[in-house]
A protein has these predicted regions:
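Secreted glycan hydrolases and related glycan-binding modules that recognize and/or cleave
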Residues: 1-202
Length: 202
Protein backbone atom coordinates (compact mmCIF):
# COMPACT_ATOMS: atom_id res chain seq x y z
CA UNK A 1 0.00 0.00 0.00
CA UNK A 2 1.70 3.19 -1.13
CA UNK A 3 0.92 6.69 -2.32
CA UNK A 4 -0.69 7.48 -5.66
CA UNK A 5 0.52 11.07 -6.26
CA UNK A 6 -2.36 12.37 -4.13
CA UNK A 7 -2.85 13.53 -0.54
CA UNK A 8 -3.90 10.20 0.96
CA UNK A 9 -0.41 9.06 1.99
CA UNK A 10 0.07 6.16 4.39
CA UNK A 11 1.94 8.34 6.91
CA UNK A 12 -0.34 11.38 6.75
CA UNK A 13 -3.77 10.21 7.85
CA UNK A 14 -5.45 11.54 10.98
CA UNK A 15 -6.38 9.10 13.74
CA UNK A 16 -9.90 8.95 12.27
CA UNK A 17 -8.55 8.57 8.74
CA UNK A 18 -6.24 5.75 9.81
CA UNK A 19 -9.05 3.96 11.63
CA UNK A 20 -11.43 4.15 8.66
CA UNK A 21 -8.79 3.23 6.07
CA UNK A 22 -7.77 0.24 8.20
CA UNK A 23 -11.38 -0.99 8.15
CA UNK A 24 -11.46 -0.66 4.37
CA UNK A 25 -8.17 -2.53 3.97
CA UNK A 26 -9.41 -5.30 6.26
CA UNK A 27 -12.52 -5.71 4.11
CA UNK A 28 -10.38 -6.12 0.98
CA UNK A 29 -7.99 -8.54 2.68
CA UNK A 30 -10.86 -10.75 3.78
CA UNK A 31 -12.84 -10.50 0.55
CA UNK A 32 -9.86 -11.52 -1.58
CA UNK A 33 -8.24 -13.80 1.03
CA UNK A 34 -5.04 -11.74 1.05
CA UNK A 35 -2.24 -12.48 3.53
CA UNK A 36 -2.29 -8.89 4.76
CA UNK A 37 -0.85 -5.48 3.92
CA UNK A 38 2.61 -3.98 3.45
CA UNK A 39 3.11 -0.21 3.73
CA UNK A 40 5.56 1.91 1.73
CA UNK A 41 5.58 5.68 2.38
CA UNK A 42 6.35 7.29 -0.98
CA UNK A 43 4.64 8.97 -3.96
CA UNK A 44 2.29 11.12 -1.86
CA UNK A 45 1.53 14.83 -2.20
CA UNK A 46 1.43 17.25 0.73
CA UNK A 47 -1.85 16.94 2.64
CA UNK A 48 -4.52 19.61 2.98
CA UNK A 49 -4.54 19.96 6.76
CA UNK A 50 -8.07 21.41 6.73
CA UNK A 51 -9.28 17.94 5.72
CA UNK A 52 -10.17 16.00 8.90
CA UNK A 53 -9.07 12.72 7.30
CA UNK A 54 -5.49 13.94 6.86
CA UNK A 55 -2.60 14.94 9.13
CA UNK A 56 0.93 16.26 8.92
CA UNK A 57 3.28 13.52 7.60
CA UNK A 58 4.94 11.79 10.55
CA UNK A 59 6.21 8.56 12.02
CA UNK A 60 3.29 8.77 14.44
CA UNK A 61 0.71 8.81 11.62
CA UNK A 62 2.34 5.83 9.92
CA UNK A 63 2.52 3.96 13.23
CA UNK A 64 -1.13 4.73 13.94
CA UNK A 65 -2.22 3.28 10.57
CA UNK A 66 -0.28 0.06 11.16
CA UNK A 67 -1.68 -0.20 14.69
CA UNK A 68 -5.26 0.31 13.46
CA UNK A 69 -4.77 -2.34 10.77
CA UNK A 70 -3.53 -4.90 13.28
CA UNK A 71 -6.38 -4.04 15.64
CA UNK A 72 -9.07 -4.60 13.00
CA UNK A 73 -7.48 -7.67 11.35
CA UNK A 74 -5.23 -9.38 13.93
CA UNK A 75 -5.12 -12.57 11.88
CA UNK A 76 -3.51 -10.78 8.91
CA UNK A 77 0.08 -9.69 8.31
CA UNK A 78 0.87 -6.00 8.76
CA UNK A 79 4.33 -5.22 7.40
CA UNK A 80 6.54 -2.30 6.48
CA UNK A 81 8.99 -1.23 3.78
CA UNK A 82 11.39 1.24 5.42
CA UNK A 83 11.02 4.54 3.58
CA UNK A 84 9.78 8.09 4.03
CA UNK A 85 8.29 8.60 7.49
CA UNK A 86 7.89 4.88 8.12
CA UNK A 87 10.97 3.05 9.39
CA UNK A 88 10.84 0.12 11.79
CA UNK A 89 13.27 1.98 14.07
CA UNK A 90 10.95 5.01 14.28
CA UNK A 91 7.63 3.23 14.82
CA UNK A 92 5.93 4.50 17.96
CA UNK A 93 4.08 3.02 20.90
CA UNK A 94 0.37 3.53 20.13
CA UNK A 95 -2.22 3.34 22.91
CA UNK A 96 0.28 1.39 25.01
CA UNK A 97 1.01 -1.15 22.26
CA UNK A 98 4.63 -1.53 21.13
CA UNK A 99 5.53 -1.77 17.42
CA UNK A 100 6.55 -5.41 17.90
CA UNK A 101 2.89 -6.22 18.50
CA UNK A 102 1.48 -4.47 15.42
CA UNK A 103 4.34 -4.72 12.90
CA UNK A 104 4.85 -8.33 11.85
CA UNK A 105 7.72 -7.74 9.42
CA UNK A 106 10.01 -4.93 8.30
CA UNK A 107 12.18 -4.77 5.20
CA UNK A 108 14.85 -2.22 4.30
CA UNK A 109 15.11 -0.26 1.08
CA UNK A 110 17.38 -1.39 -1.77
CA UNK A 111 20.26 -3.58 -0.68
CA UNK A 112 20.00 -3.22 3.07
CA UNK A 113 18.91 -5.04 6.22
CA UNK A 114 16.06 -3.81 8.42
CA UNK A 115 16.58 -3.09 12.11
CA UNK A 116 14.07 -3.95 14.83
CA UNK A 117 11.92 -1.26 16.39
CA UNK A 118 10.66 -1.19 19.97
CA UNK A 119 9.47 -4.64 20.99
CA UNK A 120 10.60 -6.21 17.72
CA UNK A 121 13.26 -8.87 17.17
CA UNK A 122 15.62 -9.52 14.27
CA UNK A 123 13.33 -12.42 13.33
CA UNK A 124 10.76 -9.80 12.27
CA UNK A 125 13.34 -8.12 10.01
CA UNK A 126 14.56 -8.91 6.51
CA UNK A 127 18.28 -9.60 6.39
CA UNK A 128 18.48 -8.29 2.84
CA UNK A 129 16.33 -6.43 0.32
CA UNK A 130 17.19 -7.60 -3.21
CA UNK A 131 15.92 -5.65 -6.22
CA UNK A 132 16.28 -8.11 -9.09
CA UNK A 133 15.66 -5.74 -12.02
CA UNK A 134 18.51 -3.39 -11.12
CA UNK A 135 20.61 -6.09 -9.51
CA UNK A 136 20.93 -4.33 -6.15
CA UNK A 137 21.36 -6.19 -2.88
CA UNK A 138 23.85 -8.87 -1.90
CA UNK A 139 22.68 -12.32 -3.02
CA UNK A 140 25.78 -14.30 -2.10
CA UNK A 141 25.43 -17.62 -0.32
CA UNK A 142 27.82 -16.52 2.43
CA UNK A 143 25.89 -13.33 3.20
CA UNK A 144 22.59 -15.22 3.31
CA UNK A 145 24.09 -17.75 5.72
CA UNK A 146 25.58 -15.09 7.98
CA UNK A 147 22.31 -13.12 8.11
CA UNK A 148 20.40 -16.27 9.01
CA UNK A 149 22.91 -17.09 11.75
CA UNK A 150 22.62 -13.52 13.07
CA UNK A 151 18.89 -14.12 13.62
CA UNK A 152 17.22 -12.33 10.70
CA UNK A 153 13.86 -13.87 9.83
CA UNK A 154 13.66 -13.63 6.06
CA UNK A 155 14.92 -12.17 2.78
CA UNK A 156 12.97 -10.05 0.32
CA UNK A 157 13.19 -10.23 -3.47
CA UNK A 158 11.28 -7.77 -5.64
CA UNK A 159 11.05 -6.31 -9.16
CA UNK A 160 11.43 -9.54 -11.10
CA UNK A 161 11.99 -9.04 -14.84
CA UNK A 162 11.35 -11.93 -17.28
CA UNK A 163 13.98 -10.59 -19.67
CA UNK A 164 16.63 -11.22 -16.97
CA UNK A 165 15.28 -14.62 -16.06
CA UNK A 166 18.48 -16.69 -15.91
CA UNK A 167 20.48 -14.27 -13.76
CA UNK A 168 17.54 -13.76 -11.40
CA UNK A 169 17.06 -17.50 -10.86
CA UNK A 170 20.79 -17.83 -10.21
CA UNK A 171 20.60 -15.14 -7.51
CA UNK A 172 17.63 -16.88 -5.88
CA UNK A 173 19.51 -20.20 -5.96
CA UNK A 174 22.50 -18.63 -4.23
CA UNK A 175 20.37 -17.19 -1.43
CA UNK A 176 18.44 -20.46 -1.06
CA UNK A 177 21.67 -22.37 -0.53
CA UNK A 178 22.74 -19.93 2.19
CA UNK A 179 19.39 -19.84 3.99
CA UNK A 180 18.30 -23.47 3.71
CA UNK A 181 21.38 -25.46 2.65
CA UNK A 182 19.26 -26.76 -0.21
CA UNK A 183 19.34 -26.38 -3.97
CA UNK A 184 16.57 -24.36 -5.58
CA UNK A 185 15.50 -26.38 -8.62
CA UNK A 186 15.66 -24.47 -11.89
CA UNK A 187 12.10 -24.14 -13.25
CA UNK A 188 11.13 -25.92 -16.46
CA UNK A 189 8.09 -23.79 -17.30
CA UNK A 190 6.55 -20.37 -16.65
CA UNK A 191 3.27 -18.48 -17.03
CA UNK A 192 2.85 -15.42 -19.20
CA UNK A 193 1.21 -12.38 -17.64
CA UNK A 194 -2.51 -12.93 -16.98
CA UNK A 195 -2.33 -16.48 -18.35
CA UNK A 196 -2.99 -19.89 -16.80
CA UNK A 197 -1.23 -21.68 -19.67
CA UNK A 198 2.15 -23.26 -18.92
CA UNK A 199 4.96 -22.27 -21.27
CA UNK A 200 8.12 -24.35 -21.57
CA UNK A 201 11.42 -22.65 -20.79
CA UNK A 202 13.84 -23.20 -23.65
Amino acid sequence: ILGNQDEAGVAQLSDMGAREFARELAAYCRAYNLDGVAFDDEYSNSPDLSNPWLARPSAYAGSRLMYECKAVMPEKIVSLYNLGNMYSSSLQVIDGIEPGQYCDYAVADYGGAAGPGTGMTLKQCAGMSIELRRGSGNSSESTARSRKEAGYGYYMFFALDPSLYSSQVYRCQSVCKGLYDETLIYPSYYYKKNSTQREAIN
